[in-house]
Amino acid sequence: MKTKRLVVVAGGAVAMALGVLTHEMAADAGAVGSGKIKHVLLLSIDGMHAVDYYDCMHGIAGVNGGDPYCPNLAALGKTAINYVGTTSSRPSDSFPGLAAIVTGGSPKTTGLYYDVAYDRSFDPPEQKTGTGLSGGPCTAYGTPSGTTTDYDQGIDYDDTKLNGGAPGAGVTDGGIASIDPKHLVRDPSTGCTPVYPWNFVRTNTIFSVVHAAGGYTAWIDKHASYSFTAGPGGKGLDDYYSPEVDSNVIALPGVATALGVPCSPIRDLSNTNSWTASFDNIQCYDALKVQALLRQIGGANHNGGAATVPALFGMNFQSVYIGQSVNESTVGKGGYLNAAAAPTTFLLNEIQFVDASIGEIINALKGAGIYDDTLLIVTAKHGESPIDTSQYLADGTFTPATILGNDIPYSESPHNSTGIGATEDDVSVLWLKKGVSVASAVDTLRQYSSKIMLGEIYYGPTLALNYNAGGWEAGQDPRSPDILVTPNVGVTYSGSTTMIGDHGGFAHDDTNVIMLVANPGFTAETVSTGVSTAQVAPTIVQALGLSTTSLDAVRIEGTSVLPEVQAQLIK
């Protein structure tokens, strides 16, 4: 079993073994920030499409009187390279989406397919997670049973609390301390030790590379599980902050949105079970993170303690994604008015809030005297589908997982009424039980193609080419799925009536995201050729004066830097 795992992750294993070489390659390129760029600030506006930026920058009929509605992003674009053909990861879930940005790799290399996925070489957690993954046995150095891997809010001590239930933490101070090791899947090959998020990712990250080269690093996100950004060993981040986005909403004294709205008392009392359930409350959640980022720009840590301005830092915004996808029963529907991506009033407000927040961030960079030597990258982990909400169809009754309910592990099966559920949004990612024929399962799905509104199905060579050959045998990847199904555009397998969109799939609306790379010394430029969010990673390390090959995934996959950045930097 140990041999199997070494073979299937050969690229990652070799990269880890060459840690000294990696450090030397980084050092050979010079000290962090030895060139023009001293800092890189990375912002992910989750859900924001390339067309969202186009519309808000130019204006669109029927919205805001036809006038532009993102003045700060539009101003940023005047000294930025705009990559209009950017694609996110596939699957386009947040977990692999962020992994692509910070590693330069795809799921076959990083091992991150979804926040809730499957690994045939691990065993279940000791206790049931907050999202329903049951605990189970683990025999040290024995044969693994395989398990669903839960890396969302379920690994928190208490995901109803903004601090994730972190022992002794302040009310708003979520982060690594929020992780309950009893909620983590276990690795029998290491004596059943819990697999922390930073050890779940197979490759190093931009944060671990910059940290190893002497740079101070920080990241802000939505779950403690996104601390995978620290990279293997967990030492790549000096400051990680992740207030739990799926916690109960509380008042936030001293926090106000960039639009000037105070967050105490609670803005929307009708939806307090999660920050993601309300157009208003999600802005306060993001404002809390912006406040932490502003502290970091000022040379403090996220709590205001003494630190230094990071060489590499950033955060994600949730508000646009919520504005795109939520149907708030007591308020109204978000999303779009038409296929041209004209936003509804609710989505418009979220875009304006994020834009105002970015204005605050830029002003803070200027106030700290570091704007000129900061490279600012604005992109998105994923898009959202469908933009044309009339095409939205949520079907939780006939999905690939329900059709194959007896052929997939019980932890993934819809037949498990108290379990965490299948990995299905506007994509279905399927891992089969040991011994189940892939060809037979595919034939079954084809028999129900009209029921599941089948778009495309990937298995065998069509899957292995980009995702490795998955399976239980030596030489097969224990994490790679057996089958991937993408439905017709607009169809999601969630069955949700509180959503009017989703992501995870391969559709254009899922994957064509905003990408701006900006610096005050840049000349505005539009690049129309296709690029990927994975190219952000080598672009960042190169801008900071380090070698792109210090990134494991770059060496393995050959990921290139984004075009034109270096030319703009040296002009």
Please identify what each model-predicted range represents.
Residues 144-149, 153-189, 193-260, 551:
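Catalytic-site neighborhoods of secreted/periplasmic enzymes
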Residues 373, 380-435:
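Acidic/histidine-rich catalytic neighborhood
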Residues 223-224, 228-239, 300-353, 390-392:
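Active-site His/acidic residue clusters
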Residues 352-395, 466, 540:
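Metal-dependent active-site segment of extracytoplasmic phospho-/sulfohydrolases and closely related
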Residues 82-102, 220-230, 316-318, 554-561:
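Short, solvent-exposed turn/loop segments enriched in Gly/Ser/Thr/Pro and often Arg
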Residues 53-111, 216-218:
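Short, structured active-site-proximal loop/turn typified by the sulfatase FGly-forming signature C/S-X-P-X-R
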